[in-house]
Amino acid sequence: MNLQKRILVVDDEPDFASIVQGNLEKEGFAVDVAYNGVEGLQKVQANPPDAIVLDVMMPEKDGYIVCRELKEDDKYCNIPIILLTAVASHVTSTRYTHADGMATEADDYIAKPASAEEITKSIKKLLDLS
């Protein structure tokens, strides 16, 4: 029986997604990648992962909308979601805030630049693997 945990990384920056994917695979996770919110939702519906790393600012559907849709769906509401955003550290008011992230019922919220190690640590904690 395969007990390997599956992680979906949804980020429109291929280089960042690749770094996170590589780090997670080194830690023994199976990783799938999507490059926008619509593709991410399709991958969740086709094969639900054990956890999701979800960028906030993406084309087609942003991470807040994707997170909200998943948390409101009984089939997917228990999948841990980590939201990532580059705007959390901005002093000026933006359309994306930490409070917005937590309002989506995300399980964790990490500001970019986030290290792949920080993301891996959060996933392990959320999946009770730490």
Positions of predicted regions on the chain:
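Non-catalytic signal-transmission and effector/linker regions of two-component phosphorelay proteins
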Residues: 1-6, 117-130
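Charged docking surfaces used in two-component/phosphorelay signaling
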Residues: 18-26
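Helix N-cap/capping motif at the beta->alpha junctions
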Residues: 33-42, 63
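Short amphipathic alpha-helix used as the core "switch/output" element in two-component signaling
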Residues: 42, 64-77
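Active-site beta3 strand of CheY-like receiver
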Residues: 47-53
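Active-site residues of response regulator receiver
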Residues: 55, 85
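Receiver (REC) domain active-site loop signature in two-component systems and cognate sites
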Residues: 58
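Alpha4 helix (beta4-alpha4-beta5 surface) of REC/receiver domains from two-component response regulators
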Residues: 65, 88-110, 117-121
